[in-house]
Amino acid sequence: MGICELQAQTGYTLSSPSGRLRTTVAAGEELTYDLALDGRTVMEPSALALELDDGTVWGRNPRVKRAWRTSVDTTHPSPLYRSAEVHDRYNALILEMKGGWAVEFRAYDDGVGYRFVSSVRKPFHIMNERVEYRFPHDFEATVPYVKTGADGNWESQYHNSFENTYTTAPLSGLNPGRLAFLP
């Protein structure tokens, strides 16, 4: 059984090892991904892009040169963690694009992640990363907001011990002017 299928020449489907999570990555005018859990859409097609200092945008009109997949099922020793070993099990989809870059998606049983990969030999700076999260419903979220600093400005939110109380609210009720962190 394949974990990656070509769809309409621009869409690629990747499933988690258990098959419960599925993401479809599409390379059209934009690079997009979606997410489904047990066949239920939890994220609609959402764009990804990186803007470089020379004006290049990885993710705008991407052209796939080559696509391949791999599966990993291994353990790593973890002498400083609460478990002696960490189990690493995922399926991956790598899309190599024209222009010297690629995007890799990994589907684990409990989540999907991505990363941009460069084969460009000259130095560059990333000016902006665009990542959308287009939810089909106004889901409820539990969010730990970063405490604002004494001056109340945006930068003061970066000085943080990552300890805080959590706010539970619909996505539409979250504060876009506040930083949050992952628990």
Task: Show which residues each predicted segment covers.
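Bacterial Sec-dependent N-terminal signal peptides
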Residues: 1-10
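N-terminal accessory beta-strand-rich subdomains and adjacent acidic, glycine-rich linkers
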Residues: 11-183
